[in-house]
């Protein structure tokens, strides 16, 4: 199954999803596809018209361009996902969590899709980390 991870560039969540036999949907792969695209002259600085249109599908024109840009990458992944893992309250250095508007929109899009999802709190010590990994493992095994 295809599992969207939030934050979308979390290597920890990416690895867990892969270890339990699922396909992680992450921003790393989406960005790689953009960089390999010959339409983009100076990756990753340029956007195509298609990117702008994709972003407008998920957020209106009055929404900051950074939010629309992120959603132009993440929105299609959420639409493709069969399930989702959401890390709650991570520190700013855990993936790309600096834009709260983007984060809220991602959670809304996942909820609106109605796909199976799990929200786990970011662990602050070893015990919590083990419990978090256990919750994610149980969720992923239940998807098979």
PLM features: what roles do these ranges have?
Residues 1-144:
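An N-terminal assembly and electron-transfer interface module characteristic of large anaerobic redox
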């Amino acid at each position: 199954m295809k599992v969207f991870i939030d934050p979308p560039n979390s290597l920890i969540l990416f690895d867990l999803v892969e270890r339990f036999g699922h396909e992680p949907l992450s921003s790393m792969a989406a960005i790689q596809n953009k960089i390999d695209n010959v339409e983009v002259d100076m990756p990753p600085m340029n956007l195509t018209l298609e990117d702008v249109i994709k972003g407008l599908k998920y957020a209106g024109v009055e929404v900051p361009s950074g939010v629309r840009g992120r959603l132009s990458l993440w929105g299609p992944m959420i639409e493709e996902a069969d399930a989702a893992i959401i890390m709650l309250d991570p520190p700013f250095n855990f993936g790309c969590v600096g834009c709260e508007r983007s984060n809220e929109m991602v959670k809304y899009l996942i909820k609106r899709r109605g796909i199976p999802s799990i929200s786990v709190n970011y662990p602050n010590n070893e015990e919590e980390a083990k419990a978090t990994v256990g919750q994610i493992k149980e969720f992923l095994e239940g998807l098979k």
